[in-house]
Amino acid sequence: MAAVDEFDEVVGRYHLALDEFSRGNPDPVKEFYSTRDDVAIANPFFPLTSGRERVVERLERSVRNFSDGEVGFQMVVKWVSSGDLACLVELEEWRTKVGGREDVTPFTLRVTTLFRAEGGGWKVVHRHADPITTARPAESVIPE
């Protein structure tokens, strides 16, 4: 199977794992992350962190914020380079209970995910997710 076709199949499974994450189950997503120590994650709940142990801990803590959810995806960019690196840039459209709330809340994340061919498959080596999906004034980066 060509690297691009194989990656398409992995993206489909990764999206299903993120759907599980929105329901409070971190295990399928954790399986996608690299076991190497150069793995990194940045999400809306915590600062950037790296290292397999710390990334898994952040996933386990982050998932506690979600239940009863689902995620839709808008692919913006997808590429595979030299057969060993791949990138997704997409909008994730979440509908989930957040932070113990009783109502399902919709929100969108802007996400960049880097994958590396590793151990006979594709593993996430970096994921950055944030809620910035519209233009903001320059002053918005200045802390109050």
Q: Which residue ranges define each predicted feature?
A:
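Short, conserved active-site loops that position catalytic residues or coordinate cofactors/metal ions
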Residues: T35-D37
